[in-house]
Structures are given as C-alpha cells and as structure tokens.
C-alpha cells in the first residue's frame, strides 16, 4: 500500500513539474516576442537623431512625375518628429528644410560625400540612443516592386563596442520592420537586412537604422507616399517599432533640435 501511494505521489509530482515548465516556457516566449530579442532595458527617456535623406542640391531618387525623394523623406521625418514629441524623447534633426549639409564647391559626388560625412558627424557627436535615416527606394527595372524595408549596419571590425551597436541596431531594425508589416498591412513581408555599403553606416558608434519607406517607381505606392495621411501612418509605424525597444510612455515633451541650423 505504501509503495502504491508513493508511486501515485511521484506521478502527481511529475505532472505538477510538467505544468510549471509549460507555463514558464509560455511566459518566456511572450517576453521574447515583445522586444524582438532585445537585450536593452526599458528607458525613462531617449535621444534620437532623425536624418531625412538627401536635400538641397541632392534630390535623391525621382519618380516618373518628377516627385523628388528628398521632399517626401523630409515630410515623413517631420511626421515622425511630431509623433516623438508626445514622448520623453530629445529629437535632433539633421535638417528641417530643403538644404544640404555644409556642401562646398566641387563635383556632385564630392558634395554628396561631404553631406553624408556631416550627417554622420552630427550622429557621432550626439551619441543618441538611435539614429534613424529616412529614405525612399526606386527600381525602374520592375515597377511592380513595392514595400518598406529596414536596414542596419554590419561592421567588418570586431570591436566589442561596435558589435554591441550592431546588435542593438539589429534589434531596432527588426522591431521597426515588424511594426511596418503590422501597421501598414500592404501584403508585403520583408526582413530587416544588414548592409555595409552605406557611408553613414561605416564603423558605427551608436545604434543606427535606415528605413526605405517605399518605392517611387511603383505608381500605387507613389500615390500613397505623397499623401500626408499615409506619411503619418508610416511615421507612427516606425515609432511603434522603435518604442517596442525603448518602452517609453507619453509624458513631458522635450526639445527638438535642428542640427542644420544650430
């Protein structure tokens, strides 16, 4: 009788341990899904650089109707700034108007490089929690291609600090990509990708991402990209992804700084 009772007790103990393990696994899965493999702790405030791509003499890509990438980049960036103003975020804009950053005389290629170097200089000086560059894509070889995609830097050097920046950049990029997929709902599934052929990504000193918000070469997407409401939707989706990592709550507004005119 004692042996039988002991066997029953052992069996019940196994059942209890199994249920506990299942519950623990489920809880961990929910937590992992919340922050897209992020290792960062939630913050009380943040510093973010918003970098509207191109500007001034550099129009970036252009649509068939003449729409310049630089203009939509700025419009989306300003919408993103408005969203961030509702949170404890100190925002530094690389530009808030149609200007290039400190171009000097020279050929176009040289001037573009100087512009990018100045943007990167601002980011390096500020050392934000995140720098996000806003751009648009263009693929005239296939006008059916559409959808937003997020990129993050891949460094060639193996420094511990750089690896940490790259991992955090990847976390932000994956969170923003997922948010775009959920909030834009355009039927296009994309994966955040690493990229090492962008000057502004070279040897990162802080977390950085670049968001290609859509394709100017796709007529349907172009029509949406020119609409203020869609730009607001994109900005909201980008911020939702960023805040998935930062976990900020709406609160006291912080100052917006325009680095191009400071």
Q: What are these regions, as identified by a protein language model?
A:
Residues 63-71, 220-221:
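Periplasmic OmpA-like peptidoglycan-binding domain that tethers envelope proteins to the cell wall
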